[in-house]
């Protein structure tokens, strides 16, 4: 399913990465709690993951190492105020987008 830009309006999201960045540049993400999304060039969501406080870059790297980025070329982060809000947002987004790499 293609990314809906209105998702950043969710009350759990306090900020987000400026836009989608190349997956290879994931270290540019801020080290905050939140949800990260992998997508292809057409913004079809391939994977959604969560990161606790100060763990965004580490969690994205771990997901890449676990091959969760298969078919993806872009990454975006939606930052939250807490791990709990990140987990709640992740659950909602996975249910909505049903990403292929979350099923493996």
List each model region and its residues.
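A short, exposed loop/beta-hairpin motif centered on an aromatic-Gly-Thr core
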Residues: 45-48, 73-81
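Acidic, divalent-metal-binding catalytic cores of TOPRIM
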Residues: 95
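Coupling/hinge elements of helicase-like and P-loop NTPase modules
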Residues: 99-104
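Basic, amphipathic alpha-helical patches used to engage nucleic acids or provide basic targeting signals
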Residues: 55-67
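GIY-YIG nuclease catalytic motif and its immediate N-terminal context
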Residues: 1-56, 84-92
């Amino acid at each position: 399913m293609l990314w809906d830009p209105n998702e950043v309006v969710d009350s759990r999201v306090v900020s987000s990465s400026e836009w989608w960045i190349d997956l290879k540049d994931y270290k540019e993400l801020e080290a905050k709690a939140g949800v990260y999304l992998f997508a292809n060039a057409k913004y079809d969501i391939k994977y959604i993951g969560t990161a606790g406080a100060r763990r965004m870059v580490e969690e994205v790297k771990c997901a890449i190492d676990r091959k969760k980025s298969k078919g993806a070329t872009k990454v975006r982060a939606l930052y939250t105020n807490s791990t709990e809000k990140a987990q709640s947002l992740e659950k909602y987004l996975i249910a909505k987008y049903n990403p292929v790499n979350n099923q493996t």
